[in-house]
UniProtKB/Swiss-Prot annotation:
CDD domains: homeodomain (cd00086). Residues 159-171 have a biased composition (Polar residues). The gene is Arx. Belongs to the paired homeobox family. Bicoid subfamily. Residues 222-252 have a biased composition (Acidic residues). This is Homeobox protein ARX.
Amino acid sequence: MSNQYQEEGCSERPECKSKSPTLLSSYCIDSILGRRSPCKMRLLGAAQSLPAPLASRTDQEKAMQGSPKGSSAPFEAELHLPPKLRRLYGPGGGRLLQGAAAAAAAAAAAAAAAATATGTAGPRGEVPPPPPPAARPGERQDSAGAVAAAAAAAWDTLKISQAPQVSISRSKSYRENGAPFVPPPPALDELGGPGGVAHPEERLSAASGPGSAPAAGGGTGTEEDEEELLEDEEDEDEEEELLEDDEEELLEDDARALLKEPRRCSVATTGTVAAAAAAAAAAAAVATEGGELSPKEELLLHPEDAEGKDGEDSVCLSAGSDSEEGLLKRKQRRYRTTFTSYQLEELERAFQKTHYPDVFTREELAMRLDLTEARVQVWFQNRRAKWRKREKAGAQTHPPGLPFPGPLSATHPLSPYLDASPFPPHHPALDSAWTAAAAAAAAAFPSLPPPPGSASLPPSGAPLGLSTFLGAAVFRHPAFISPAFGRLFSTMAPLTSASTAAALLRQPTPAVEGAVASGALADPATAAADRRASSIAALRLKAKEHAAQLTQLNILPGTSTGKEVC
């Protein structure tokens, strides 16, 4: 039988002798790695045990059904061909043109490398043309003709099996996408019915890549693998539901969690020995027999893609659409909490008080805002990260001595303007602020004399608005004491309270006295700012408190100072 098979195969395909050593060398990597090699089975004479009527019967069944599963498929085990490709390109499958066009994207790299692997020129290494008439067993009904047709079909489809295992990195997606679709137990898939009719779902469940094509009597191992894969995917779904509680963590934690689960699936499916074999097989970029990801493929596949394929999306023929659809499914399953404006206001108010609320504060906030405590905790983590990012960006964009974006502290650069001296010297950190203020004043009032020393001030890179001056202590500068500035402030209203600015600037002398008196109040205020977390929100709150204190100071001595002004 094997001699007849070799002779008829050679008569049908004259170039088969040049192919045989190529076939042997293309699978030498698999034999080194200890995997079942279909070439080894062929050389050992696996075809001898099959009589000619049985071979012709299975060949005719394959021709009628176009199915990858028969009751006993000798050539399928030898050909080492994925059932998905076998259905499209096998004898009787018709090698449909639309199937070839759809699979062209997945086999683009394999087509170019197949010509190199087979060692033959011409159409042997390319995407297969329509089948020759020798591959249709319906025309030959006798036993020898059927065997010859089977040999021709075997050699005809060998060029797909000899392609280097580059395009097989998607085999896990076929396996995982197809496995949850199977309504009956997988044993029914392997045995098949007496008529041998296989459903499309069963074809999908078998499409795990060339490494998992079962040998004769190797069906039970594949069944156990599929059952283990189903259980592992259910475990993955439960773990993903648990992971969604912390989905809005920082990005590095999220990526770590995504990378963790595909590795867990890989180890759970195979055990330590097969995992070591998978690590060795990564050099050849082939999938191991269980059809799981090798470590190299885990790095190549997007982590969200690998985790997101939970069998809910259908099998895609091209590799690009496969990853996109898995990613889309992943995005649909993950949800984000949308906070109302009231919830955000309350959370911001709590964040102003403390950046690190204890568990009681978080639970109280969660009860009040109708949120879970985990959501409140995640919001505070994200808010702290955003605050640190802004602080870092503020420290980079502003010079270190410029006080306005930074927090209030005991050594605030405004401290020289809070002492009792009526005309203190310039503080170098405020030079750009004075330049901006003088430029705005000169534009509004050309008759206003410039402040002393303004000609020697450095030009400001970005003019700061007058609203950055946080209190009346800044007005100790001589330019702010002239009455003309009162009209400027009353038109622009730069402070948080416009009435405070007008009251301070209508009477310049009480402004000086109020600023001097507020110097005594500066120490407890800055101590309170130190107790609070030093954030931008705390800075705004501090400015409001300072303006309120100055208003009270201006009202209390208002009668006596009014007489002095008159």
